[in-house]
Amino acid sequence: MGLSRAPTPTRTFERKMQKAQRNRVAAAASTSDAPRRLWSEPECRDLLVVGPGVLGSRVAVGWLAKYPGAVVVGQTNTDASHEGLESLGVYPRVKNFDADDATAGRTFPYVVFSAPPSGSEDYPGEVESALKYWDGKGCFVFTSSSAVYANEAGEGCDEDSPVYEIGTNPRVDRLLTAEKVVLDAGGSVCRLAGLYHSERGAHKYFLKTPKLDSRADALVNLIHYEDAASLCVAALASKSKSSVFLGTDGVPVTRGDIAKLSIESGAYEDAVSPEFTAVDGPMGRSMTNPRTRSSLGWSPKYESFQAFMTSHGALDTYSPRYKPERPRFSPTGRPHQQGA
């Protein structure tokens, strides 16, 4: 009996890609009758997602829907989510991949960095390392936060509003330093407001916290995870260079109304409105993003938090009430850097 040979890295990559492609075809068949090509297109649309968590995995799904022939690689810290990523049609690899990994020698025309700062001691350094995988031809997108904007007295805020000075806040410093690394290299930045979906976000925190030392009338700016992902896809596809985009639904809502709307939706059992005890403090910002919308041709599916809780019934693909035709992969992991 002959000895079986161990699979080479190339064979392993091919097998994983074949599995990912089969999953992609099955997903496509359940949602569309359009033909799906499985191999690279003449203009390469391959994408590397650094940090394919809740946001990054949604970007990967959106990119594959837009460019079915693309190869999408998801780079993670561990292999815990790799099986789930494969089910989405994504080829997974760990950050510290072996030198003989089948993807080790290549760069990508499109890269999105969506890993949160909480997962790294040297966040700007992590972003700089990710830039080495970009070939400069398509677009590199870094997902930052609207928390970098300095105005918090309730006034208007858009893409070009002033940001904090370096040295004001260590949390913001990490983001602004990482942004500069990206912009100087020709990449683009998507500053995202507070991210949420039916089971994650400020509303979930409010509903489980009886007393909050904050103002009920302070403004919060939000964007649904699905809309943040579609914004990133639009930014990538635009091939923009050294641009700053702002992700927000453009309809700020008070903390008190976030709790009120969530309770009135009826989607959260035994939900009780928290007591907001503060009467002083920052009022927040009133954010709009006209330049982002016009330059990318983008608008949010969930036009406001109120609309999500009322017109949409707090129902999205993350909701326990959602009944997909196929099993779904719902990554968890660290929360993304929250804007406001």
Where are the model-predicted features located?
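C-terminal amphipathic/interface module of NAD(P)-dependent oxidoreductases
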Residues: 280-340
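Conserved Rossmann-fold NAD(P)-dependent oxidoreductase catalytic core, especially the SDR/UDP-sugar
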Residues: 128-170
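Alpha-helical substrate-binding/gating segment
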Residues: 204-212, 218-245
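NAD(P)-cofactor binding segment of oxidoreductase domains
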Residues: 106-142, 177
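Conserved beta-loop-beta element that borders a ligand/cofactor-binding pocket
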Residues: 179-199
